[in-house]
């Protein structure tokens, strides 16, 4: 195995978290569809797909590194929220937890002198900065006096 067992275990746990995030964002897209917020529906669908791609990236890395891969069950996701702001706030909270997980993994990789694993994690750490910034900005704007229909112009298109 080309990476530490400790990091491999954490990455396997992260696979579940990435698939979980994909489910959560898909549920949020369903919620937005019910509100006829097509821009937000598309935004959350893209977020869902992106999280799935993150999980697959980890699966491929573990496989190529000769580490065991486990795919655990992912619980269902909510499709109802009190407001669009609630959905975006929960997204930001979740992305912050994911960022914490990747920082912990980077620390474990360093402690085990796992340079390969540490290098792999750098992309995810950069990605998390972007994700947190997007959701923090969206949350801040939604906390203003915008109603959901005015907010329809907010979600990034790509």
Mark where each language-model region is:
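Iron-associated oxidoreductase/ferritin-like identity signal
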Residues: 1-158
